[in-house]
Amino acid sequence: TESTIQSQEYRLEAFEQFCREEGIENLNDLSGRDLYAYRVWRREGNGKGRDEIEPITLRGQLATVRSFLRFAAEVDAVPEDLRTKVPLPTISNAGEVSASTLDPERADVILDYLQMYQYASRVHVIALLLWHTGARMGAIRGLDVDDCELEQDNPGIQFVHRPQTDTPLKNGEKGQRWNAISDHVANVLQDYIDGPREPVFDEHGRRPLITTSQGRASTSTFRTTMYRVTRPCWRGAECPHDRDPETCEWTKQKTASKCPSTRAPHAIRTGSITHQRNCGVPSDVVSERVNATEGTIERHYDMRTYRERMEGRREHLEGLE
């Protein structure tokens, strides 16, 4: 079907980008080592406009690469056995759902710290938007200043699919939407825009909301930001892993993701969605807000316990005898 073709094209675009970055211009130059490196590269969320992905999604994307290499072998473009060197992750039923999430209590502590000590900084804005909206990292990265209506009685931000200027939404035009934000979030964004935001344009002449001195903040900026602020020692808290921050290698930027306490942007999204459901926000409202189907939310994002789900249904059953 047309949707299947589009999905396969999207998956192979990431593989094509990896090959370009690695200087691989001919399929004959591909090796098993390259294919394993691609698996790691994609798992960690590399690729323009891409987010970190869960094992079940990674398996699907690697399976598409396998299918492509099988076709390439049929036309003698690559060795017959090359596709077998694409390493597919083993997925169990339990492994199809990530247990990595950010608890609301930790989110509150982090945001309170940023509110107190790094108010309206880029770090504060990234963490606040990821948690408050539950949106994907790529969607927040793609926001422009003009996508924000902050001085209205009902402030909001608009997510727009702009693939021609390097900020696509995962679900294309179907992912376009307005998200309501609280007055507090609107005030923080306005103070960031009026204050520490770097007043720069990106290479397409757009005014990004979240910037560095070089232009629009990169996905690696988002990831390193969240790895840093979710590490307890960053805000002076005791290390839960009995490490000395002065000597711990996890405090370095390149190895921060290895700390068991750190959380990637995708885990912030998971925690936010679970929190919204725990607060009684209907699943269809959450679905539209975070641009994911109710089935996807139920299976991959809603980390509530069975007890918490029961409590969420209780208010709807009060009229029953």
Across the structure, where does each feature detected by a protein language model lie?
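Conserved tyrosine-mediated DNA breakage-rejoining catalytic core shared by Y-recombinases
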Residues: 142-191, 197-203
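C-terminal secondary-structure termini that scaffold catalytic or DNA-interacting sites
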Residues: 315-321
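Short, basic (Lys/Arg/His-rich) helix/loop patches that form interaction surfaces
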Residues: 22, 224-288, 295
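Catalytic-site neighborhood detector that most strongly recognizes the C-terminal catalytic loop/helix
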Residues: 290-315
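Basic, Lys/Arg- and aromatic-enriched nucleic-acid-binding interface segment
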Residues: 104-137, 141, 174, 204
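A short, glycine-centered helix-capping/turn motif at helix boundaries
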Residues: 76, 129-143, 279-281, 290-292
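N-terminal core-binding DNA-recognition domain of tyrosine recombinases/integrases
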Residues: 1-97
